[in-house]
């Protein structure tokens, strides 16, 4: 008993030390953000306010890394295409590169889209709205990460600005038409992600997994799937990211994507042909072909995420910085280049937040919603980029977080559907077997079928293996070869996994309202502090 208590104490002590180290590193980063604002900020007499804003922006960036980046690498980690440590390293590097290389476009503050500019034309009020929105979004992301719910960082910031804007100028100031698009994205994003992921999963099952000669089918089909992913990724990066560096028209975008896709097809075709002698005609062996594409997908998604979502942390901070620097500039609608020091705060904060607190949400997306193999993870990654690309071309409001999580749920629901079909198929097989056997061994056959129906996946495998080896048992002699094959097919298609749908959907629905409430309260609190302190 004493030894057990000592071990538990040592375990708790190690966890405390680990948590303390994480907090210390986070505090050091926030101090670094404050120093950057002090050294490079040009806020004149309002230097302390800019330092405070930089600390809040850094805190927001860390929460984005801890919560939102899980969508990019979760499926790859859950399918074991890459280790947790490897995923964090790749994602952290690519997030920083994306933020610094392609995230510094001319920034137009979100404020102009959520609250009408004419209602907030005072620089002092505008700065308080931005501070309240940043802090409210960061606090909600922190809570969502603690409870294990991946939520949209964009919606968190939108809610914060909406709440602070209403507290500053009333409900009339809110752009309700823009917010209706946010509400629509709650349905559009996960639904599109789920449907596209389900389509590609069924395509892979029909063209590879359900074939007798899986190996030959995979050697033919997989290079085309990887080429399609290359086309969509290259097009996505051009449309969503690289246009910030150099604008290209639609025809050139498509041509560049097709050229890259053709090149990747040729290279990957050679890769699979070289790997062919090592492959077996099994699902597990074919899965290995998706390893490399998944790693590249995680890296590219992280790069794109760093370029896009870093604005949620640095957009309000950049707006505050510019307002403090030039009091005569038009409030909230001025376009300004983001200072490099602000880009560094955003990029480093996302990378640090991912490294310290990202594994929890990575596990949630990668394995807790549903078990994923590499084929399924590939479908999720492909669905994510296709959905974002389609939505951007159609002008639909979507959230990358909702898309990826929706795709994971879609894969899980499809597997549940296949499981139900397997059960119905098993019921028909069972009835046919029982009807075909009228001997003294009927009771034993019925008992075997009942045990098979109730067994889990591993137990079914053992029962089929035992049935195969036991040539002299009554059941083995009575069951025909076709009947045994039917049972084996039912076993292979059945998958059991619980989901956490309710918690995540609830978190999605309350993100904007909770962030708005926090934003309003924090705006009022900032005004109170300024007035009395």
Swiss-Prot record:
Its main location: membrane. It is found in: Cell membrane. Signal peptide: none annotated. The chain crosses the membrane at residues 23-43, 47-67, 81-101, 129-149, 156-176, 182-202, 221-241, 248-268, 286-306, 338-358, 372-392, 509-529. The keyword Ribosomal protein does not apply. It comes from the Bacteria. The keyword Protease does not apply. GO terms for biological process: phosphate ion transmembrane transport. It is a multi-pass membrane protein. Keywords: Cell membrane, Membrane, Phosphate transport, Transmembrane, Transmembrane helix, Transport. InterPro entries: Phos_transporter. One of its GO terms (molecular function) is phosphate transmembrane transporter activity. Belongs to the inorganic phosphate transporter (PiT) (TC 2.A.20) family. PANTHER family: PHOSPHATE TRANSPORTER. This is Putative phosphate permease HP_1491. It comes from Helicobacter pylori (strain ATCC 700392 / 26695) (Campylobacter pylori).
